[in-house]
């Protein structure tokens, strides 16, 4: 999926799960704020919201016996490894890659669990 401009969640990213969609909005906002201000505080805040969201989403997958939980968790862990490697100020190319990752992850990976959680 194309990276939205301005960088914000929109209905193209709707998973049909209100709590997950709300958290996805927070992820978009976190990366947008990091791109705008690029401070250590914003970097830590972005890492925190991604960590919390991935924990919540993976918990919902486990409770629903979602068949692809491990594969999905591995994808999350890979991105968290990337984010935790970022240093403030985060280079523009890393920010753009992170923004693209999220914009692509939701429709390619998260949409696989629609109707299954």
Swiss-Prot record:
It comes from the Eukaryota. One of its GO terms (molecular function) is oxygen carrier activity. Fe cation 2 binds at residues 57, 72, 76, 105, 110. Fe cation 1 binds at residues 24, 53, 57, 110. InterPro entries: Haemerythrin (IPR002063), Haemerythrin_Fe_BS (IPR016131), Hemerythrin (IPR050669), Hemerythrin-like (IPR012312), Hemerythrin-like_sf (IPR035938), Hemerythrin_metal-bd (IPR012827). The keyword Transport applies. Keywords: Iron, Metal-binding, Oxygen transport, Transport. It holds the Pfam family Hemerythrin. PROSITE patterns: HEMERYTHRINS. Octamer composed of two types of chains: alpha and beta. Hemerythrin is a respiratory protein in blood cells of certain marine worms. The oxygen-binding site in each chain contains two iron atoms. Belongs to the hemerythrin family. This is Hemerythrin subunit beta. It comes from Lingula reevii (Inarticulated brachiopod).
């Amino acid at each position: 999926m194309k990276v939205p401009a301005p960088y914000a969640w929109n209905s193209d990213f709707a998973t049909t799960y209100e709590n997950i969609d709300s958290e996805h909005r927070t992820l978009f906002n976190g990366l947008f704020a990091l791109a705008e201000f690029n401070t250590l505080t914003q970097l830590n805040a972005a890492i925190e919201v991604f960590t919390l969201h991935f924990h919540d989403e993976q918990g919902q997958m486990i409770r629903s016996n979602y068949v692809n939980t491990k594969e999905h968790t591995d994808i999350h862990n890979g991105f968290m490894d990337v984010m935790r490697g970022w240093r403030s100020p985060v280079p523009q190319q890393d920010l753009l890659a992170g923004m693209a990752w999220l914009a692509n992850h939701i429709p390619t990976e998260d949409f696989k669990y629609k109707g299954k959680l």
